[in-house]
């Protein structure tokens, strides 16, 4: 499945929100790695990470994450009369529980919440990016299933899809000497 949205309307986002679970926070969190890469490249980047262990999309109150709070530094200078005048985040990365998009029992609920969360992100003026997760180490055949399911759902909702899982599989295949997985065979190692 090919992504329908292949670029962001803001080609140089400066703020982001990562919404996910342990795939997002494992090994000190994705937010720290991306911040380091951005800093090394001289790219301005600030981000917040909100994760729930074993969290499904339905566990995340997205509208609350994007609502202004008087002490929130991401809302500073963007609130008038209790309402946002500009988005708190340029981009919001939405990452589901890794098996939700391919588990027959989970798919309907996952699609329902992905649709509502993408709509809430857009309503807040941010751009939604749906994260394509990677397969478990002992189930590499799930890589394509995950990518197809997630990209299809992102397309249906007018959201970009970030092919992390496809890149993870390609890197793992290209460097079999590096262990990309933690001992549990699902979370990433520091190299992953």
PLM regions and their residue ranges:
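Short hydrophobic segments within beta-strands
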Residues: 19-20, 131
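N-terminal low-complexity, Pro/Thr/Ser-rich intrinsically disordered segments
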Residues: 1-15
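Short, surface-exposed connector motifs at secondary-structure boundaries
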Residues: 14-17, 127-128
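Conserved catalytic region of serine esterases and O-acyltransferases that act on ester linkages
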Residues: 10-12, 180, 192
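Alpha-helical cap/lid subdomain in secreted, periplasmic
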Residues: 77-190
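Conserved SGNH/GDSL esterase-like catalytic core that processes O-acyl groups on lipids
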Residues: 15, 24-109
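Short, well-ordered coil/turn elements that cap or connect secondary structure elements
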Residues: 11, 40-42, 123, 156
């Amino acid at each position: 499945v090919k992504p329908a949205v292949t670029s962001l309307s803001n080609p140089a986002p400066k703020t982001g929100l990562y919404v996910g679970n342990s795939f997002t926070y494992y090994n000190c969190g994705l937010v720290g790695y991306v911040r380091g890469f951005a800093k090394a490249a001289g790219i301005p980047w600030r981000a917040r990470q909100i994760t729930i262990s074993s969290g499904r999309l339905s566990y995340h109150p997205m509208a609350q994450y994007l609502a202004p709070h008087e002490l929130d530094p991401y809302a500073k200078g963007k609130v008038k009369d209790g309402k946002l005048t500009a988005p708190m985040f340029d981009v919001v990365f939405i990452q589901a529980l890794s098996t939700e998009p391919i588990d027959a029992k989970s798919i309907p609920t996952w699609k329902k919440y992905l649709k509502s969360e993408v709509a809430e992100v857009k309503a807040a003026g941010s751009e939604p990016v749906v994260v394509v997760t990677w397969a478990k180490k002992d189930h590499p055949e799930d890589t394509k299933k995950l990518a197809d399911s997630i990209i299809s759902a992102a397309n249906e909702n007018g959201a970009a899809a970030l092919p992390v899982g496809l890149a993870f599989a390609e890197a793992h295949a290209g460097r079999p000497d590096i262990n990309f997985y933690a001992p549990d065979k699902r979370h990433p190692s520091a190299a992953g």
